[in-house]
């Protein structure tokens, strides 16, 4: 009943909701329940000052009142199989890692192609477990017509807010309801008024029987990833360096957002989903830090590694693992720190991330229709004072905390021109076309009609800022960061045998 590929089982009633959450089917008409925070983006998307579903909740009284959503999907796990032997066929330990990767890709391709043809809406991926000691293929069926059915007011769905988030037990009505739709043959289909509620192979029947302390509980869904096996120095970096810095940066963003959201109902709706995303990781990182300290995780890791080192003293394959990991994590620290600040203080600025996304769309020849949709979606939920004030704070933090050798030369050049980060930010917002929808459309129309779109885009200071930091990150930070992590993965692969 738990997992079967030959008959309906619990796996057919549990779905992966939009790639990041679990959801469960609770009726024979495709009704599914997930967390309120998992459905929050679409509750916000449908909200307005006139119809504030975030504040008041939403309930579809009929099928016709259910709300279609953009950019949403649910995936059913069809099956998962151990394909280690097939994937590693032809592997020789003397191979380089790049040759091994090529072999794995070549051996995986036929498996993925065959599995993807097994049914409508099927897709497959081959993923490593235990740092490449084992490989599984996961086969999914994906549905994209998923409609909002109901959600409680945020006073219920987010009761306790950040104080209770990531804490247990807690008392909150953290749920929302959606319905999966399919074509007349019960297969995945793009949104259409002709689609009908999906008929699941299996669904969970809700019980209102009394529950007692100690009753058996079985949790079924799609959990996140574990870092259970990481090295002690990785734990130290997370608790002592990475999380404190990232939380500080997000605290400043949250303070700015909260200030303006409290002043305007429209801005509150615009930034509710963004604010939840920022605060969710902010609270998680606090819990990680406190948990590592409370449980003495670093000290326990160190003790275990010392015992491992004693055990490995007469085993050549394992003898140097811990010293090598110590050395590599020391080399990695600067690049990890620069990566954290690139993501949390540079790309965290909306205008800069918007510029990056536009540049990516142009480089992939997405076309005018795609760009029009991007512009419309961006400015629907954009409030310049929040972005500008946050940018001032985040760039100042970058200047204060990131060592010179980890910065792009562009940073020093601009500081020579403007003198302060505040003056630099003011210049960007005073001269960039990306601060208004009209200015953005004019700029992009010019770029679309130009023989060289990059020349047009790079005349705008927001694009220059985005491009310079991104190129520096890719060339000077991410390249060594990736290489060192590759070496760490190789050591973990041996460590986990």
Map each language-model feature to its residues.
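Terminal presequence/propeptide segments associated with secretion/organelle targeting
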Residues: 1-497
């Amino acid at each position: 009943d738990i997992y079967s590929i030959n008959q309906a089982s619990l796996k057919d009633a549990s779905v992966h909701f939009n790639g990041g959450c679990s959801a469960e089917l609770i009726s024979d008409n495709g009704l599914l329940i997930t967390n309120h925070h998992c459905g929050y983006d679409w509750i916000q998307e449908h909200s307005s000052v006139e119809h504030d579903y975030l504040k008041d909740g939403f309930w579809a009284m009929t099928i016709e009142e259910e709300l279609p959503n953009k950019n949403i999907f649910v995936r059913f796990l069809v099956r998962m199989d151990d394909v280690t032997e097939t994937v590693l066929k032809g592997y020789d330990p003397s191979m380089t890692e790049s040759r091994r990767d090529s072999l794995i890709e070549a051996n995986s391709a036929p498996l993925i192609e065959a599995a993807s043809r097994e049914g409508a809406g099927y897709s497959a991926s081959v993923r490593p477990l235990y740092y490449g000691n084992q490989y599984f293929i996961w086969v999914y069926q994906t549905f994209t017509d998923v409609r909002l059915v109901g959600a409680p007011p945020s006073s219920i769905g987010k009761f306790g807010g950040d104080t209770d988030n990531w804490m247990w037990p807690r008392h909150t009505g953290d749920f929302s309801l959606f319905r999966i739709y399919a074509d007349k043959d019960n297969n995945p289909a793009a949104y259409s008024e002709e689609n009908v509620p999906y008929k699941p192979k299996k669904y969970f029947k809700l019980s209102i029987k009394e529950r007692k302390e100690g009753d058996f509980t079985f949790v079924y869904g799609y959990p996140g990833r574990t870092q259970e096996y990481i090295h002690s120095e990785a734990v130290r970096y997370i608790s002592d360096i990475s999380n404190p810095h990232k939380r500080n940066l997000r605290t400043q963003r949250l303070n700015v957002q909260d200030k303006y959201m409290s002043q305007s109902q429209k801005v509150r709706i615009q930034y509710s989903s963004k604010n939840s995303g920022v605060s969710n990781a902010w609270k998680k990182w606090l819990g990680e830090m406190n948990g590592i300290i409370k449980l003495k995780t670093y000290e326990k890791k160190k003790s275990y590694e010392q015992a491992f080192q004693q055990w490995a003293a007469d085993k050549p394959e394992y003898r140097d693992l811990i010293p090598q990991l110590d050395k590599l994590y020391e080399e990695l620290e600067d690049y990890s720190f620069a990566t954290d600040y690139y993501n949390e203080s540079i790309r965290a600025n909306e205008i800069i991330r918007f510029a990056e996304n536009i540049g990516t769309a142009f480089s992939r020849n997405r076309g005018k229709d795609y760009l029009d949709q991007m512009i419309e979606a961006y400015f629907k939920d954009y409030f310049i004072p929040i972005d500008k004030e946050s940018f001032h704070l985040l760039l100042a933090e970058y200047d204060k905390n990131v060592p010179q050798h980890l910065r792009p030369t562009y940073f020093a050049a601009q500081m020579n021109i403007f003198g302060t980060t505040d003056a630099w930010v003011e210049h960007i917002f005073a001269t960039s076309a990306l601060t208004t929808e009209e200015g953005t459309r004019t700029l992009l129309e010019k770029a679309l009609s130009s023989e060289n779109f990059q020349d047009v885009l790079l005349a705008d200071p927001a694009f220059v800022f985005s491009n310079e930091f991104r190129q520096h990150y890719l060339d000077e930070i991410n390249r060594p960061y990736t290489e060192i992590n590759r070496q760490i993965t190789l050591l973990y692969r041996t460590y986990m045998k």
